[in-house]
């Protein structure tokens, strides 16, 4: 009898690590994007929690008037925020080792830059991880494409806008009231409500909510009854079942009669593509609008566009919005400037010394 002995193939430690990282059998898929995503998001989350609780006030405007943002310095959940990096730092990369001390780093708002840059890298890697897992499972890549909309929006307010304005101090604060302040100041300086890309974003978000509610209610109302009257209709569904769980023909007929025939989809695939594409495209446009307004390509200006035969201005809603913009403009950063340029009606006279 002849025995054939084969050398058992041994996998190197690196090979086993690669197999584990890219395995779709793990409870949570890691992937190569996850190798970068996990530490960056953990860093951003940890620093955010610590700074939100205990960070000292930050000199956001660079004029030695620190603004308090943490809970231990008098704020609550609604008023608290991570205050953006000081205008004195501008767009400079400001890690801890660039400051003379940790106290100086905190005073100049170093945590904001640290959190934002790690967060943006982390969410971009999360998007890449979505694509990677889809690829490994043989799925189409549209989940990552849909997620690109919130990634683009976050990148616009945390990175592109500060770059366009010349300072991270113009970025969106990481808190509830800080977000509202950012929105108000953005309207005052860029008239975002009159920008068509923002209008498309509003249509995307509100329209997406409407279509989601319509679709969910139509499906729930046209379930195929698999249970008795004494049981929940939801109990009639088995995970992975081959049969349709609702009657799309009934839903199509209902909606077609409610509005008109061609307002209703008769193709489930095109319907779900529409449900995904509508809000995604809207948010893409909003992110693009923020990115263009970052460089002061602002919303439409229809101020004083209607006059009577005598040349007197007849106010429109555009003029009312403009008046509100001026009020918001003079109220923010009130000690950082003596007189806003927006309110300077004529060019200042030259002074000959």
Curated annotation (Swiss-Prot):
Note: 2 of the reaction center chlorophylls (ChlD1 and ChlD2) are entirely coordinated by water. Herbicides such as atrazine, BNT, diuron or ioxynil bind in the Q(B) binding site and block subsequent electron transfer.
Chain positions recorded as [CaMn4O5] cluster binding sites: 170, 189, 332-333, 342, 344
Binding-site list for Fe cation: 215, 272
Modified residues (N-acetylthreonine): 2
Binding-site residues, chlorophyll a ChlzD1: 118
UniProt protein name: Photosystem II protein D1
Residues of the site described as Tyrosine radical intermediate: 161
């Amino acid at each position: 009898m002849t025995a054939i002995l084969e050398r058992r193939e041994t996998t190197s430690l690196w090979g086993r690590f690669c197999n584990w990282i890219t395995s779709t059998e793990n409870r949570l898929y890691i992937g190569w994007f996850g190798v970068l995503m996990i530490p960056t998001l953990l860093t951003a989350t940890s620093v955010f929690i610590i700074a939100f609780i205990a960070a000292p006030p930050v000199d956001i405007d660079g004029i030695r008037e620190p603004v308090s943002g943490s809970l231990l310095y008098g704020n609550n959940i609604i008023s608290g925020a991570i205050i953006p990096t000081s205008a004195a730092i501008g767009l400079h990369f400001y890690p801890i080792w660039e400051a003379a001390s940790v106290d100086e780093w905190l005073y100049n708002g170093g945590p904001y830059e640290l959190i934002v840059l790690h967060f943006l890298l982390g969410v971009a890697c999360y998007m890449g991880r979505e694509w990677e897992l889809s690829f490994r499972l043989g799925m189409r890549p549209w989940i990552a494409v849909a997620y690109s909309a919130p990634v683009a929006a976050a990148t616009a307010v945390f990175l592109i806008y500060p770059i366009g304005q010349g300072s991270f101090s113009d970025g969106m604060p990481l808190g509830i009231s800080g977000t509202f302040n950012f929105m108000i100041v953005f309207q005052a300086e860029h008239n975002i409500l009159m920008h068509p890309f923002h209008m498309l974003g509003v249509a995307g978000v509100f329209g997406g909510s409407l279509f989601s509610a319509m679709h969910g209610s139509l499906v729930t109302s046209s379930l195929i009854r698999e249970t008795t009257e004494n049981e929940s209709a939801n109990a009639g569904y088995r995970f992975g079942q081959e049969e349709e769980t609702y009657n799309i023909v009934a839903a199509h007929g209902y909606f077609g009669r409610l509005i008109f025939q061609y307002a209703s989809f008769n193709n489930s695939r095109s319907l779900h593509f529409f449900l995904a594409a509508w809000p995604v495209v809207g948010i893409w446009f909003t992110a693009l609008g923020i990115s263009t307004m970052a460089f002061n390509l602002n919303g439409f200006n229809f101020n004083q566009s209607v006059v009577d035969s005598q040349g007197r201005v007849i106010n429109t809603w555009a003029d009312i919005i403009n008046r509100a913009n001026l009020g918001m403009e003079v109220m923010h950063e009130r000690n950082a400037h003596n007189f806003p340029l927006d309110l300077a009606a004529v060019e200042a006279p030259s002074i000959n010394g």
